[in-house]
Amino acid sequence: MHILKKPDLTDPKLRAKLAKGMGHNYYGEPAWPNDLLYIFPVVILGTIACIVGLSVLDPAMLGDKADPFATPLEILPEWYLYPVFQILRVVPNKLLGIALQTLVPLGLMLIPFIESFNKFQNPFRRPIAMAVFLFGTATTIYLGIGAAMPIDKSLTLGLF
């Protein structure tokens, strides 16, 4: 079973449409009313149905009740702030930690200028951008896992 159907260029009907400027030159069907009126609402309602169904079948459990007289040993931020928290926790100088965090967006802004000679849109044909992306993803995952561990095991992830 094929996901994409390749056009049969030997078909006389398709060749007649292509000669008139119709057909696959314009990527098939128009967005109005086909996509905007029929397909998008079905996708939106399907997404809402999945979210409601999953929340009914498996509701999220609430944590323990808050106790103002018993503070935890280590207070952790929300999960999406773990890598940033780990940088601030490990770097000895807090000003250096903040400077490291400002270097990330600056480095991301430099990528288009570094790789301006490459005109390809395919990420596999853009080695610098792909290497920076993979390195950043691996570093973020490493820092996120390390932030969830105690400080003495956070750099080695408890492996050594």
Curated annotation (Swiss-Prot):
Q: Which residues form the signal peptide?
A: none
Is Hydrolase set as a keyword in this record?
no
Q: Which domain of life is it from?
A: Bacteria
InterPro entries in UniProt: Cyt_b/b6_C, Cyt_b/b6_C_sf, Cyt_b6/f_cplx_suIV, Cytochrome_b_C_euk/bac
Enumerate the UniProt keywords alphabetically.
Answer: Electron transport, Membrane, Photosynthesis, Thylakoid, Transmembrane, Transmembrane helix, Transport
Q: Where in the cell is it found?
A: Cellular thylakoid membrane
Matching entries from CDD domains are given as: cytochrome_b_C
What GO MF terms are annotated?
Answer: electron transporter, transferring electrons within cytochrome b6/f complex of photosystem II activity; electron transporter, transferring electrons within the cyclic electron transport pathway of photosynthesis activity; ubiquinol-cytochrome-c reductase activity
**GO annotation, cellular component aspect:** plasma membrane-derived thylakoid membrane
Q: What does the entry give for GO biological process?
A: photosynthetic electron transport chain
Transmembrane segments annotated in the record for this chain: 36-56, 95-115, 128-148
* Name the UniProt record assigns to this protein: Cytochrome b6-f complex subunit 4
- Source species: Synechococcus sp. (strain CC9311)
